[in-house]
């Protein structure tokens, strides 16, 4: 088991101990909306075949660079500082002018310094309860992730293309789509996507788990599937503004956990 390499808005690090025990037996594990891939990194044992997919090209580049060019990636941070000014400079840098390794380093830096792990509308995050990321120990911190990513397929596909490509009877799709009516993910996600997701869950060969914010519209679309609720507190605005709030996380499955049993 390792840890996620970047903060991510809506990441499931704090829910891992409640979600992973629900995983069904499987041979192929697919994170269709990988994001920070918390469950992938934190599951106690790897699946024989594993896939990380995301539509965010910067994120996919980061995973591929850590997977294949870790030493050169780490070298990008030799003289780096955790600074509001550097953060603003990195935001102004056009990614298309950079090499893949430089682009991955820029994305890594921004995600580690952005408030709440947002991808868009980023502001420099400050904390008084813990130290800033130690940029001199990146190689030490990423070595476990490098080993974990070895042999994993990293895809940059629309979610439905990835799900259909890897769907087999022995596949488990974990889907953590953007929350309905929530901004900050860096991608538009119309409601029709949730409807297509529910249709896929009804027709696919494999098992599917969806984690999403609890909303009447979501419950209506996924009616007929097994629901479980967990509580979680997310902060997506400055705590001084009083915007830290508890919310319900809806876990949707196209199988009955009690009948099938768990993997771990």
At which residue positions do the language-model features occur?
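Class I S-adenosyl-L-methionine
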Residues: 1-49, 160-172, 182-264
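Conserved S-adenosyl-L-methionine
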Residues: 25-85
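SAM-dependent nucleic-acid methyltransferase catalytic core
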Residues: 1-15, 22, 37, 67-174, ...
């Amino acid at each position: 088991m390792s840890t996620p390499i970047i903060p991510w808005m809506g990441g499931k690090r704090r829910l891992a101990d409640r979600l992973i025990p629900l995983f069904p037996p499987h041979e192929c594990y697919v994170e269709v909306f990988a994001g920070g891939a918390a469950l992938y990194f934190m599951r106690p044992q790897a699946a024989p075949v594993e896939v990380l997919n995301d539509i965010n090209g910067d994120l996919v580049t980061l995973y591929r660079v850590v997977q294949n060019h870790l030493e050169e990636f780490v070298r990008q941070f030799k003289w780096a500082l955790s600074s509001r000014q550097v953060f603003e400079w990195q935001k102004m840098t056009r990614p298309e002018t950079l090499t893949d390794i430089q682009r991955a380093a820029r994305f890594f830096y921004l995600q580690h310094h952005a408030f709440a792990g947002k991808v868009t509308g980023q502001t420099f995050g400050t904390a008084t309860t813990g130290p800033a990321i130690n940029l001199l120990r990146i190689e030490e911190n990423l070595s476990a992730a490098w080993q974990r990513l070895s042999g994993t397929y990293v895809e940059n596909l629309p979610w439905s293309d990835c799900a259909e490509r890897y769907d087999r009877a022995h596949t488990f799709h974990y889907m953590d789509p953007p929350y309905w009516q929530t901004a900050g993910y860096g991608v538009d996600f119309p409601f029709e996507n949730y409807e297509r997701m529910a249709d896929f869950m009804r027709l696919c060969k494999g098992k599917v788990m969806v984690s999403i914010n609890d909303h009447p519209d979501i419950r209506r679309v996924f009616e007929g599937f097994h629901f479980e609720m967990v509580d979680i507190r997310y902060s997506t605005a400055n705590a001084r503004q009083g915007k830290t709030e508890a919310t319900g996380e809806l876990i949707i499955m196209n199988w009955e956990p009690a009948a099938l049993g768990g993997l771990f």
